[in-house]
């Protein structure tokens, strides 16, 4: 499996544009990971307060929902504006935002001051720009690889994101824990945000190495050439209509939305377990260490999925792969994911990370292969909207349905059962479409079609 992954990566690596796009993706997501850990540490891990699902939901709503609402109104620009320039401009802006956040947290009384809302606004804009940029980079991917390399590229790029985030998170954790003896916590937070600013500046330099028009978009269709940017609602309607015509991509987005709610509830409940059930409110460092171990295992699962999905999909096809990872996620959520010890939850985090990211790779592949380039910017922004809004919904449902400390055996088992049932529902819903339809745009398309005819 590892050999096939390395072989596929080597095949992609021969494309200079792909290499440069990878560099931009790693740098921007590492910087964003540093910024996110800085924000989470400052807001959620104060020794004076104990977070609950409602407070987590509030933070997620502030940082994720605004772009989920306005996403359709800006997605059309990714099908009209130069995508290389989008990368440059967004991270220039984020350099300034990260420096502003670093200055704000130097005020020890910030939480009681009106400028705390300026802090939230800065985080909101920075994270919204990150999602806008990632949608543009995803839409640009097809300009960097050959058509039959979509599956390999779609397995590598979503994995690069978590890998970059892990690097950035490790840097942020290292600053927080490594400077604890010499700096106050708010000073360490300021250093974290300043480091994130340096990372965004590096991303700008890397993006400028890409030729200005190399990432598209290709304005080939009459609609793409004539639709005014202000007609964003019409553009969104057209994108949804396009997804109805390209049913594998549309059904894939619905499926990952359901999975995101269920998996998101698991993640929020697990954070509450580590923060509120395993540890007392004042034991911030111990709680952060446990959450860091669990998050690291989850991130390792994300990375491992890149080596798993191509050989799995080559053997059974994209459609069956989606079913396999959803059912496997359900089983892992029940056992070991419903045993409340540190190591069982860490093990479950790794397994669920593999399954979750494997599903995303499959859905990314469906969107890349079935959606026309004229619609890719809008569809990937719609995808991002679903992905993040469903996570906020998951936090809200956790606050409503699960205990404040996250400790509920019935709840964790029920989430596992629902994940498995999602896989079964996907299999039944797509039965008439057939597996070869889902394998379009992959290196094993012809073999899959032949196997289907033989069966």
Show where each model-derived region lies:
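Substrate-agnostic recognition of the 12-TM MFS/MFS-like secondary transporter fold
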Residues: 20-36, 62-78, 82-97, 118-179, ...
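Helix-loop junctions on the cytosolic side of multi-pass membrane transporters
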Residues: 108, 139, 143, 189, ...
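C-terminal transmembrane bundle of multi-pass solute transporters/carriers
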Residues: 2, 57, 62, 69, ...
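Extracellular/periplasmic helix-loop-helix junction of adjacent transmembrane segments
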Residues: 34, 38-67
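Transmembrane alpha-helix termini and helix-breaking/packing motifs in multi-pass membrane transporters
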Residues: 38-47, 102-111, 167-193, 272, ...
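Juxtamembrane intracellular "pre-TM" segments in multi-pass secondary transporters
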Residues: 1-19, 213-254, 444-450
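Primarily residues marking transmembrane-helix entry/exit sites
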Residues: 14-22, 53, 112-120, 245-253, ...
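A single, central transmembrane helix in multi-pass transporters
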Residues: 22-41, 176-193, 235-306
